[in-house]
Amino acid sequence: MPLSDKTSIRFFGVAAYEIINRLGQRILLDPFMSENPACPVAFDSFDHVDLVVVSHAAFDHLGDTEALARRYGCPVICGGEVKAYLVAKGIDAETIRATTWGIRVEVAGIEVQPVECHHWSQIKMPDGTFASGVPMAFIVYADEGVRFYHYGDTAIFSDLKLQAELYQPTIGCIGIANPQEILHRNPMPGRMVTAEMSPYEGALAAQWLGLETVLPCHYCNPMDPEVAEFEKHLKALEAKRMPVPRSIVLKPGDWIEIPAGGGAVRNAA
């Protein structure tokens, strides 16, 4: 029996999201919270967590997964390398569902479809060795008519059109910026000119995926100039009479509510 007539989606900054479905289940996606300078919510402030879904092992996506699993005993869906890391850190292997592209899984009554993601995934294990694996994007079947695409740090590639044909995501997040506030965590020579997708590539990806609503992400500050550039490119595609999704720019802590009848309504934090 549904407890609500809407699906709620809240943005925590970078690529971290919370979905609360109509049954009241809380799903956390790439829960980078404690070390996220933009996140207004503490990982231990929830009354319950029903599922954590992790795209890959980067610190700003794996985030607080280990701490959440310890505190709430919630199941985790992730790739094999993330499972190996969590088990090495003492998380019960039986609470972790490893999967990869194509293997749709159901955990806690929630279906998740992993899809191809052009990126990498690597993590330092407790013993000092490194584990690598296959990064994932994924589609969360949150509610009837609500299929949430999480891009998982993917670069653009043409088979996003195939994913649209096969899975018909309705709403999704697309990374289009480099969060300047956390780049110091990975010191390297030179600079990153773009994130995994430039704003133009992100606009194309959103159009190719056939989304009804797109949430640009991978920023801490919604005033990031790359966010405005993404919006500009979406409008340019629309001016060419191409079907484009409605874009909603959220600041960390903001959420949207999707009524059971469809449509996306923005709410303030």
Describe every region a protein language model picked out.
Residues 28-31, 49-57, 77-80, 148-154, ...:
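Active-site neighborhood of phospho(di)ester-bond hydrolases with catalytic His/Asp-centered motifs
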Residues 40, 63-72, 87-91, 224-233:
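Metal-dependent catalytic neighborhoods of phosphoester/phosphodiester hydrolases
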Residues 114-146, 154-159, 167, 171, ...:
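Active-site-proximal loop/helix segment associated with metal-binding centers of metalloenzymes
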Residues 155-254:
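Cap/insert and terminal regions of metallo-dependent hydrolase folds
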Residues 1-26, 33-37, 115-118, 162, ...:
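Zn-dependent metallo-beta-lactamase
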Residues 2-7, 20-27, 104-113, 142-148, ...:
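Beta-strand-turn-beta hairpins that frame and shape the catalytic cleft
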Residues 35-36, 58-63, 83-86, 103-106, ...:
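Active-site environment of divalent metal-dependent phosphoester hydrolases
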Residues 18-58, 63-70, 78, 121-125, ...:
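Pre-active-site segment of Zn-dependent metallo-hydrolases
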